[in-house]
């Protein structure tokens, strides 16, 4: 896995739920989750397993991908991960 790249990731918790997040060091972040020092949501649902990761050139795009994913229902989330879809930010064109 790539280090120090901005990424959006999804882990599956022990109860079967998904947790999506952003990091720039995926291995360290998964370790933090599994040590109980990660997000409050995952602390009560250990262990977590990495299910999906997307690398982005910048933090903004990775966080937009995370936000987009969180708006989907479970079926759509599973389809997104299975297809290996990649979030592509749409840029607004200036009319000036």
From Swiss-Prot:
Pfam families listed in its UniProt record: GIY-YIG
UniProt-recorded name of the protein: UPF0213 protein BA_0032/GBAA_0032/BAS0034
Domain of life assignment: Bacteria
Disulfide bonds: none
Family under the similarity heading: Belongs to the UPF0213 family.
Gene3D superfamilies reported for this sequence: GIY-YIG endonuclease
Domain GIY-YIG: 4-79
């Amino acid at each position: 896995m790539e280090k120090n790249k901005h990424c959006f990731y999804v882990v599956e918790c022990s109860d079967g739920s998904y947790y999506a997040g952003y990091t720039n060091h995926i291995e360290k972040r998964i370790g933090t989750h599994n040590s109980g020092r990660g997000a409050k949501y995952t602390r009560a649902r250990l262990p977590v397993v990495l299910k999906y990761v997307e690398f982005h050139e910048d933090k903004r795009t990775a966080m937009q991908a995370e936000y987009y994913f969180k708006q989907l229902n479970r079926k759509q989330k599973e389809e997104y991960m299975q297809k290996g879809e990649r979030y592509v930010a749409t840029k607004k064109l200036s009319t000036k």
